[in-house]
Amino acid sequence: MALLGNFLCCLLVAWLCGPGLGVPLAPADRAPAVGQFWHVTDLHLDPTYHITDDRTKVCASSKGANASNPGPFGDVLCDSPYQLILSAFDFIKNSGQEASFMIWTGDSPPHVPVPELSTGTVIKVITNMTMTVQNLFPNLQVFPALGNHDYWPQDQLPIVTSKVYSAVADLWKPWLGEEAISTLKKGGFYSQKVASNPGLRIISLNTNLYYGPNIMTLNKTDPANQFEWLENTLNSSLWNKEKVYIIAHVPVGYLPYATDTPAIRQYYNEKLLDIFRRYSSVIAGQFYGHTHRDSLMVLSDKNGNPLNSVFVAPAVTPVKGVLQKETNNPGVRLFQYKPGDYTLLDMVQYYLNLTEANLKGESNWTLEYVLTQAYSVADLQPKSLYALVQQFATKDSKQFLKYYHYYFVSYDSSATCDQHCKTLQVCAIMNLDSMSYDDCLKQHL
């Protein structure tokens, strides 16, 4: 199946016959003192997706495997059809929620073998997704971050300018200023003040430079000088009394589903955490994607005192490997913050029950949970989340059972997490550096 032949089809999906939307369930009568922004991630468009009798030909992203139960909004062995992505953005547009901006943390192309893509195709996919967002939200400032699949070959994002960096810099000009465009072209990262919130700066990092499979950065102590740039930018924000939200694709810390596996190379992880700790008074939140799951982390200092709240958002794509039992329902989320100091107050997670949507032929995006209500916490501050995770660690914790259900975006209510699984989850949430993480594993495994 040729990927290139399907892009116009995606872009020309009739806007007039968009999917049906459910009524948003988030509280509508908010005080005007609360600001809001959306977070979407891991769209992973598969333009080849189509319903056909031959289940091996439904989508390129199944890599020849039989799609399990394909419908108009996708299949768990396939990346997102355009109709699924459009339904997510249509829901956001028609949700009735007022938002100041949106963050979009990368990965637009599908999971397909390297020979099935090219630099040109990757740029076309990112263009498609960017145009979709700009057409639906012409007046909303959007802050993108590049993902490891937003390049060809995948994962190999370079430390110098490239066709992809130049292309996205041009595509994202409506949202970014000249200085941001300049650093984006050079290294795939940038910082930008939020137009509607002048005291808030978004720092969009290219953490793909630190990703294990990226051979372009092997043995480089500061790829693209991003560490030096980050420290200078945070120091400037400190002096200018700005607050900062960090966004990126690949998160810091350890993967919660694997033993002793940092999401990025250990040296880079320790270096980033050191910078984040030193500027924790400036950083008001960190937001990532990449894992396709809903998880959180709390960055603490060397003495275990909580400093920063870290959120990893679930994907829009529902794709999983043939041998994987669990996957995620598609999800998007809304954060609430306090204007002025940009303290994070709450998070509202929405999702699409993919099985139900395919059966009914319409997308009923609905509320999954409101974080403070689900866990009975006051806000999203590091101390509040740290106390919550201490509850997760207790034996037979109902709070953790709830967390693990939401981890898969309510995909499978029968999913269980044994003691080993729980230890990996809790250690990853509370311990982002190698020393504290290893100590946690030794203590509990």
From Swiss-Prot:
List of residues binding Zn(2+) 2: D107, N148, H249, H290
The cofactors required by this protein are: Zn(2+)
Swiss-Prot/TrEMBL keywords: Disulfide bond, Glycoprotein, Hydrolase, Metal-binding, Secreted, Signal, Zinc
User: Which enzyme class, named as a word?
Assistant: hydrolase
Binding of Zn(2+) 1, residues:
D42, H44, D107, H292
Q: Which InterPro entries match?
A: ASM-like_Pdiesterase_prd, ASM_C, ASMase/PPN1_MPP, Calcineurin-like_PHP_ApaH, Metallo-depent_PP-like
Q: Does the record carry Lipid metabolism as a key word?
A: no
Query: What is the regulation of this protein's activity?
Result: Requires micromolar levels of Zn(2+) for activity. Inhibited by millimolar levels of Zn(2+).
- Fill in the subunit field for this protein: Monomer. Homodimer; homodimerizes following 2',3'-cGAMP-binding.
The name this protein goes by in its record:
Cyclic GMP-AMP phosphodiesterase SMPDL3A
Gene coding for it:
Smpdl3a
